[in-house]
From Swiss-Prot:
<comment type="function">
    <text>Enables the recognition and targeting of unfolded and aggregated proteins to the ClpC protease or to other proteins involved in proteolysis.</text>
</comment>
<comment type="subunit">
    <text>Homodimer.</text>
</comment>
<dbReference type="Pfam" id="PF05389">
    <property type="entry name" value="MecA"/>
</dbReference>
<feature type="compositionally biased region" description="Acidic residues">
    <location>
        <begin position="85"/>
        <end position="95"/>
    </location>
</feature>
<dbReference type="InterPro" id="IPR038471">
    <property type="entry name" value="MecA_C_sf"/>
</dbReference>
<comment type="similarity">
    <text>Belongs to the MecA family.</text>
</comment>
<dbReference type="GO" id="GO:0030674">
    <property type="term" value="F:protein-macromolecule adaptor activity"/>
</dbReference>
<protein>
    <recommendedName>
        <fullName>Adapter protein MecA</fullName>
    </recommendedName>
</protein>
<dbReference type="InterPro" id="IPR008681">
    <property type="entry name" value="Neg-reg_MecA"/>
</dbReference>
<feature type="region of interest" description="Disordered">
    <location>
        <begin position="79"/>
        <end position="98"/>
    </location>
</feature>
């Protein structure tokens, strides 16, 4: 781990994959639990701020920039104190993690699945939410590298992507939004996806209940962001 104090209010920390491994953390571990992210970032702050110049009641911002080699973390303080009333109004107690919006949705565990109720194909070839089940593909991937390759190849349109780990294997679930894509277009995208894995008999409901969701709603976009 490398640390650079940019100024009195900002510290830059470079964490390699080995540093993350020593702490029992991977980038994927940070995707699903906002409290885990906050706890991890504060543990890093405790390590690098040996002089305790960042007071515990000051507002702190964590800006994370992941890469294939690890991640870079900018820790900044505003110099303003967090009073009790402000703390009561926020779960994060003055903490902010700055990442692109769709990555923020992954980190905070936001779920857009309520947009995916019941889908079908209408006379124009488009998915109709009122008439039939969802158009969905559950893909079993040989390894994580195949997922990265798939993310680099497929620009998903009219749907969402969720990545799960179940029984030491990775599964990608592609679900297509109602009224946004024709059945032919959906099947074309599924054909591309199946070049990187095998169609699985498991359902997304089984994976959701018994597996571990690693990336939610925008798994392909998230992978392209983190693993450039």
């Amino acid at each position: 781990m490398e640390m650079e104090r940019i100024n009195a209010n900002t510290i830059r920390v470079m964490l390699g994959n080995d540093d993350l491994a020593q702490r029992g953390i991977t980038v994927l571990d940070l995707l699903g639990n906002h409290k885990q992210i906050e706890s991890f970032f504060y543990s890093i702050l405790d390590e690098v701020d040996k002089d305790h110049t960042f007071a515990t009641n000051e507002a702190v911002t964590f800006q994370v920039m992941p890469s294939q080699s690890g991640l870079e973390l900018l820790i900044s303080r505003s110099g303003q104190k967090n009073d009790d009333s402000a703390a009561d109004q926020t779960d994060d107690e003055g903490t902010d993690t700055q990442v692109p919006d769709y990555i923020r949705q992954q980190l905070q565990g936001l779920d857009a699945s309520d947009q995916q109720d019941h889908q079908a194909v209408d006379e124009g070839g488009y998915i109709d939410a009122d008439k039939a089940p969802q158009t969905e593909l559950v893909l079993k991937l040989k390894d994580f590298e195949d997922f990265i390759s798939l993310a680099d190849t497929l620009r998903l349109e009219g749907g969402k992507s969720d990545l799960y780990r179940y029984k030491n294997a990775y599964y990608l679930v592609l679900t297509f939004y109602p009224n946004e894509i024709s059945s032919d277009e959906a099947h074309d995208q599924m054909a591309v996806a199946m070049e990187f894995g095998d169609r699985s008999p498991l359902s997304s409901a089984v994976l959701s209940e018994y597996g571990k969701r690693l990336m939610e709603t925008s798994a392909l976009e998230t992978a392209r962001y983190y693993f450039k």
